[in-house]
Protein backbone atom coordinates (compact mmCIF):
# COMPACT_ATOMS: atom_id res chain seq x y z
CA UNK A 1 0.00 0.00 0.00
CA UNK A 2 2.81 2.33 0.57
CA UNK A 3 3.95 1.70 -2.92
CA UNK A 4 0.63 2.83 -4.31
CA UNK A 5 0.89 6.23 -2.65
CA UNK A 6 4.40 6.65 -3.91
CA UNK A 7 3.42 5.83 -7.48
CA UNK A 8 0.48 8.21 -7.34
CA UNK A 9 2.74 10.97 -6.10
CA UNK A 10 5.27 10.37 -8.88
CA UNK A 11 2.71 10.68 -11.65
CA UNK A 12 1.70 14.28 -10.70
CA UNK A 13 3.75 16.95 -12.40
CA UNK A 14 5.73 19.26 -10.11
CA UNK A 15 4.59 22.54 -11.54
CA UNK A 16 0.95 21.79 -11.05
CA UNK A 17 1.33 21.05 -7.40
CA UNK A 18 -0.93 23.26 -5.29
CA UNK A 19 0.10 24.87 -2.05
CA UNK A 20 -2.52 23.85 0.49
CA UNK A 21 -1.95 26.98 2.57
CA UNK A 22 -2.71 29.52 -0.17
CA UNK A 23 -6.16 29.17 -1.75
CA UNK A 24 -6.85 30.06 -5.36
CA UNK A 25 -7.61 33.69 -6.24
CA UNK A 26 -11.30 33.17 -7.01
CA UNK A 27 -11.81 31.69 -3.50
CA UNK A 28 -10.18 34.74 -1.94
CA UNK A 29 -12.42 37.18 -3.90
CA UNK A 30 -15.63 35.31 -3.18
CA UNK A 31 -14.66 35.01 0.50
CA UNK A 32 -13.96 38.77 0.86
CA UNK A 33 -17.40 39.82 -0.49
CA UNK A 34 -19.52 37.92 2.11
CA UNK A 35 -16.99 38.89 4.78
CA UNK A 36 -17.45 42.58 3.85
CA UNK A 37 -21.26 42.22 3.93
CA UNK A 38 -21.15 40.47 7.31
CA UNK A 39 -18.67 43.06 8.57
CA UNK A 40 -20.95 45.90 7.41
CA UNK A 41 -24.03 44.33 9.06
CA UNK A 42 -22.04 43.66 12.22
CA UNK A 43 -20.63 47.22 12.19
CA UNK A 44 -24.00 48.86 11.51
CA UNK A 45 -26.36 46.81 13.69
CA UNK A 46 -24.63 44.44 16.09
CA UNK A 47 -21.76 46.60 17.28
CA UNK A 48 -23.96 49.59 18.35
CA UNK A 49 -26.27 47.27 20.29
CA UNK A 50 -23.28 45.56 21.81
CA UNK A 51 -21.76 48.94 22.70
CA UNK A 52 -25.10 50.05 24.21
CA UNK A 53 -25.28 46.89 26.33
CA UNK A 54 -21.68 47.41 27.45
CA UNK A 55 -22.41 51.06 28.35
CA UNK A 56 -25.50 50.00 30.33
CA UNK A 57 -23.43 47.37 32.09
CA UNK A 58 -20.73 49.92 32.84
CA UNK A 59 -23.33 52.37 34.19
CA UNK A 60 -24.86 49.65 36.34
CA UNK A 61 -21.47 48.64 37.70
CA UNK A 62 -20.43 52.25 38.36
CA UNK A 63 -23.84 52.97 39.91
CA UNK A 64 -23.49 49.89 42.06
CA UNK A 65 -20.03 51.03 43.12
CA UNK A 66 -21.37 54.51 43.92
CA UNK A 67 -24.28 53.03 45.84
CA UNK A 68 -21.91 50.72 47.70
CA UNK A 69 -19.62 53.64 48.52
CA UNK A 70 -22.55 55.74 49.72
CA UNK A 71 -23.89 52.80 51.74
CA UNK A 72 -20.43 52.31 53.21
CA UNK A 73 -20.23 56.02 54.06
CA UNK A 74 -23.70 55.85 55.65
CA UNK A 75 -22.68 52.75 57.60
CA UNK A 76 -19.52 54.48 58.76
CA UNK A 77 -21.53 57.55 59.81
CA UNK A 78 -24.03 55.32 61.61
CA UNK A 79 -21.17 53.52 63.35
CA UNK A 80 -19.64 56.82 64.44
CA UNK A 81 -23.06 57.99 65.66
CA UNK A 82 -23.55 54.70 67.50
CA UNK A 83 -20.09 54.96 69.09
CA UNK A 84 -20.82 58.56 70.11
CA UNK A 85 -24.15 57.53 71.63
CA UNK A 86 -22.46 54.62 73.37
CA UNK A 87 -19.79 56.92 74.81
CA UNK A 88 -22.50 59.38 75.89
CA UNK A 89 -24.47 56.55 77.49
CA UNK A 90 -21.37 55.34 79.33
CA UNK A 91 -20.68 58.87 80.56
CA UNK A 92 -24.29 59.24 81.66
CA UNK A 93 -24.19 55.85 83.38
CA UNK A 94 -21.01 56.84 85.22
CA UNK A 95 -22.64 60.10 86.28
CA UNK A 96 -25.77 58.27 87.45
CA UNK A 97 -23.59 55.78 89.33
CA UNK A 98 -21.65 58.62 90.99
CA UNK A 99 -24.89 60.44 91.86
CA UNK A 100 -26.36 57.25 93.30
CA UNK A 101 -23.18 56.65 95.30
CA UNK A 102 -23.22 60.20 96.70
CA UNK A 103 -26.95 59.95 97.44
CA UNK A 104 -26.31 56.61 99.15
CA UNK A 105 -23.56 58.17 101.26
CA UNK A 106 -25.86 61.09 102.10
CA UNK A 107 -28.64 58.69 103.07
CA UNK A 108 -26.20 56.71 105.21
CA UNK A 109 -25.00 59.91 106.89
CA UNK A 110 -28.62 61.00 107.47
CA UNK A 111 -29.50 57.59 108.89
CA UNK A 112 -26.44 57.71 111.17
CA UNK A 113 -27.45 61.19 112.34
CA UNK A 114 -31.02 60.01 112.96
CA UNK A 115 -29.74 56.92 114.77
CA UNK A 116 -27.45 59.10 116.91
CA UNK A 117 -30.34 61.45 117.70
CA UNK A 118 -32.60 58.51 118.52
CA UNK A 119 -29.88 56.95 120.66
CA UNK A 120 -29.32 60.23 122.51
CA UNK A 121 -33.06 60.62 122.98
CA UNK A 122 -33.36 57.07 124.30
CA UNK A 123 -30.39 57.58 126.64
CA UNK A 124 -31.85 60.89 127.86
CA UNK A 125 -35.24 59.26 128.32
CA UNK A 126 -33.53 56.45 130.22
CA UNK A 127 -31.73 58.95 132.43
CA UNK A 128 -35.02 60.74 133.11
CA UNK A 129 -36.71 57.44 133.92
CA UNK A 130 -33.83 56.45 136.18
CA UNK A 131 -33.97 59.83 137.90
CA UNK A 132 -37.74 59.51 138.36
CA UNK A 133 -37.35 55.97 139.68
CA UNK A 134 -34.53 57.09 141.95
CA UNK A 135 -36.67 59.93 143.27
CA UNK A 136 -39.56 57.51 143.81
CA UNK A 137 -37.26 55.02 145.54
CA UNK A 138 -35.73 57.77 147.70
CA UNK A 139 -39.20 59.00 148.63
CA UNK A 140 -40.33 55.47 149.46
CA UNK A 141 -37.15 54.82 151.42
CA UNK A 142 -37.54 58.07 153.35
CA UNK A 143 -41.10 57.18 154.17
CA UNK A 144 -40.14 53.67 155.27
CA UNK A 145 -37.09 54.94 157.13
CA UNK A 146 -39.24 57.54 158.80
CA UNK A 147 -41.75 54.96 159.90
CA UNK A 148 -39.00 52.60 161.00
CA UNK A 149 -37.22 55.35 162.90
CA UNK A 150 -40.47 56.40 164.61
CA UNK A 151 -41.15 52.80 165.56
CA UNK A 152 -37.60 52.48 166.83
CA UNK A 153 -37.82 55.77 168.72
CA UNK A 154 -41.13 54.75 170.28
CA UNK A 155 -39.58 51.47 171.39
CA UNK A 156 -36.55 53.23 172.80
CA UNK A 157 -38.53 55.95 174.52
CA UNK A 158 -41.32 53.73 175.50
CA UNK A 159 -43.95 56.24 174.56
CA UNK A 160 -45.85 56.90 171.43
CA UNK A 161 -45.14 59.91 169.30
CA UNK A 162 -48.52 61.24 168.42
CA UNK A 163 -47.89 64.55 166.86
CA UNK A 164 -47.61 64.17 163.08
CA UNK A 165 -45.91 67.53 162.69
CA UNK A 166 -43.34 66.59 165.28
CA UNK A 167 -42.93 63.26 163.63
CA UNK A 168 -42.38 64.67 160.19
CA UNK A 169 -39.98 67.34 161.52
CA UNK A 170 -37.90 64.72 163.33
CA UNK A 171 -37.86 62.49 160.30
CA UNK A 172 -36.94 65.32 157.95
CA UNK A 173 -34.09 66.45 160.23
CA UNK A 174 -32.79 62.90 160.44
CA UNK A 175 -32.93 62.35 156.69
CA UNK A 176 -31.36 65.73 155.97
CA UNK A 177 -28.53 64.73 158.24
CA UNK A 178 -28.18 61.49 156.30
CA UNK A 179 -28.15 63.39 153.01
CA UNK A 180 -25.42 65.69 154.33
CA UNK A 181 -23.37 62.73 155.47
CA UNK A 182 -23.96 60.99 152.11
CA UNK A 183 -23.01 64.11 150.12
CA UNK A 184 -19.84 64.75 152.12
CA UNK A 185 -18.87 61.09 151.82
CA UNK A 186 -18.92 61.21 148.05
Curated annotation (Swiss-Prot):
Where would you find this protein in the cell?
Cell membrane
User: In the record, what terms sit under GO molecular function?
Assistant: proton-transporting ATP synthase activity, rotational mechanism; proton-transporting ATPase activity, rotational mechanism
* Annotated transmembrane regions: 28-48
Cystine crosslinks = none
Which of UniProt's keywords are assigned here? ATP synthesis, Cell membrane, CF(0), Hydrogen ion transport, Ion transport, Membrane, Transmembrane, Transmembrane helix, Transport
The record's section on InterPro entries has: ATP_synth_B-like_membr_sf, ATP_synth_b/b'su_bac/chlpt, ATP_synth_F0_bsu_bac, ATP_synthase_B_chain
Q: What is this protein called?
A: ATP synthase subunit b
Record's family?
A: Belongs to the ATPase B chain family.
Protein purpose? F(1)F(0) ATP synthase produces ATP from ADP in the presence of a proton or sodium gradient. F-type ATPases consist of two structural domains, F(1) containing the extramembraneous catalytic core and F(0) containing the membrane proton channel, linked together by a central stalk and a peripheral stalk. During catalysis, ATP synthesis in the catalytic domain of F(1) is coupled via a rotary mechanism of the central stalk subunits to proton translocation. Component of the F(0) channel, it forms part of the peripheral stalk, linking F(1) to F(0).
**Does the record bear Ribosomal protein in its keywords?**
no
- What Gene3D superfamilies does the record point to? F1F0 ATP synthase subunit B, membrane domain (1.20.5.620)
Q: What is its main location?
A: membrane
Report quaternary structure and partners.
Answer: F-type ATPases have 2 components, F(1) - the catalytic core - and F(0) - the membrane proton channel. F(1) has five subunits: alpha(3), beta(3), gamma(1), delta(1), epsilon(1). F(0) has three main subunits: a(1), b(2) and c(10-14). The alpha and beta chains form an alternating ring which encloses part of the gamma chain. F(1) is attached to F(0) by a central stalk formed by the gamma and epsilon chains, while a peripheral stalk is formed by the delta and b chains.
What's the superkingdom here? Bacteria
This chain is encoded by the gene named atpF
Note the topology in the membrane.
Single-pass membrane protein
Amino acid sequence: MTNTFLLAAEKLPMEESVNPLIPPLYDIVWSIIPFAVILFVFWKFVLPKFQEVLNQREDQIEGGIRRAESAQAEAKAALEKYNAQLAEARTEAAQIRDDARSQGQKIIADMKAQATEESNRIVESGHKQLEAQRSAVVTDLRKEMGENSINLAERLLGEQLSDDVKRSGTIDNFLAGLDNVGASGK
